[in-house]
Regions:
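Short His-centered aromatic/hydrophobic patch
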Residues: 15-21, 41-42
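Donor nucleotide-sugar binding/catalytic pocket of nucleotide-sugar-dependent glycosyltransferases
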Residues: 66-111
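A conserved mid-protein helix/loop that constitutes part of the nucleotide-sugar donor-binding site
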Residues: 121, 130-144, 212
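Glycosyltransferase donor-sugar binding loop
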Residues: 126, 151-168
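Nucleotide-activated donor-binding/catalytic signature segment of Leloir-type glycosyltransferases, i.e.
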Residues: 166-185
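Aromatic "clamp/platform" in nucleotide-sugar-dependent glycosyltransferases that forms part
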Residues: 203
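Short hydrophobic beta-strand element within catalytic cores of glycosyltransferases
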Residues: 220-223, 228
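Conserved acidic donor-binding segment of nucleotide-sugar-dependent glycosyltransferases
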Residues: 236-248, 255-262
Length: 315
């Protein structure tokens, strides 16, 4: 509240994540709001998950959230059109909303993958350890394929304070699971290139940052077919999708990759390397942090009256 009191009428406030937006809106509730405010919703999060308690909470908070969002924000920015439609309808939002499909990635520090193995491919899931990220589906897949020509790795930590987070006892079970290699936290920029295939099994995403980083680095990616993955990464090479987080379909895709002619005749470095080069070019032209910051700057210019209108360059 101290921060909101110090704001001037011509300031622009840009808030990231729905949770932070609601906290800002609550702090802003009892002041005469003269600032221009933007909320970027990077994913709808726990409140819009399939968790029973979350569903009840969403109903109870509906009127309150509708009032907060409409009073406090001039612009809502989403990362996919399903989230846009869902939350605009829920909050009865009457302002302007647009799509900017990612927060962007900083590519300078990312170490690029140089070679692809043709046996004992390393599969990784790198994520916060919460239920809706598909952790247990990934464990089931690793158990199903424990005798295959793949090695399964899990990177990430439990998310303290998140009601959907795995418990310490569940994490201990993962550490003792012989089908999986638990890594804990890793430095994505320096370590991800050591793996061959990245799996994203999230049940919801605004936009998957790890997927974009993996495609830039050069990993082959298989993702659950949800708006937060397909809306962006369907434009890339070396990217495959599975409907409904189907474990058998993930297995089939992995087997198809290892049986690809490029692996069989040892030309995988050229085949997947060319796809990775294409991905890096596409990301450098459209989806780096610098490019996304430039897109937001156009919104700031519009709110300051420096340009007459704003239209998102992303479709």
């Amino acid at each position: 509240r101290k921060i909101t009191k110090s704001l001037n009428y011509d300031d622009i406030v840009h808030v990231y994540t729905l949770k932070s937006g609601l906290l800002f809106a609550f702090a802003n509730l009892f002041r005469n709001n003269k600032t221009k405010n933007i909320l970027t919703i990077t994913g709808l999060g726990y409140l819009f998950s399939n968790n029973f308690k979350a569903k009840i909470l969403k109903i109870l908070l509906s009127f309150f959230i509708t009032h907060l969002i409409n009073k406090s924000f001039d612009f809502l920015i989403y990362q996919n059109n399903i989230d846009q439609k869902t939350f605009n309808n829920y909050s009865k939002y009457n302002g302007e909303s647009y799509i900017i499909p990612t927060s962007g990635i900083t590519v300078k520090e990312l170490q690029i993958k140089k070679e692809y193995r043709n046996s004992n491919l390393k599969i990784i899931m790198a994520t916060r350890l919460i239920n809706d990220k598909g952790i247990f589906e990934y464990l089931d897949l690793a158990d199903l394929m424990k005798d295959s020509d793949f090695e399964f790795y899990l990177a990430g930590d439990i998310d303290n304070g998140n009601p959907d987070s795995l418990s310490k006892s569940q994490l201990d079970e993962i550490k003792n699971n012989k089908s999986i290699n638990y890594l804990g936290h890793i430095d994505i920029s320096k370590e991800l290139h050591n793996y061959d295939v990245n799996l994203v099994m999230s049940k919801y995403e605004g936009s998957s940052r790890i997927l974009l980083e993996s495609l830039y680095i050069g990993l082959i990616c298989i993702s659950n077919n949800i708006p937060g993955t397909t809306a962006l990464s369907s434009k890339f090479s070396n990217s495959f999708f599975v409907n409904d987080n189907n474990i058998q379909e993930f297995k089939r895709n992995l087997n198809e990759i290892i049986n690809n002619d490029a692996f069989l005749d040892s030309t995988q470095n050229e085949f997947f390397g060319n796809g990775a080069d294409y991905n890096r070019k596409l990301i450098n032209e459209n989806y780096t942090s610098v490019k996304i910051a430039a897109a937001y700057n156009k919104i700031y210019q519009y709110l300051r009256g420096e340009i007459e209108s704003y239209k998102s360059e992303f479709v």
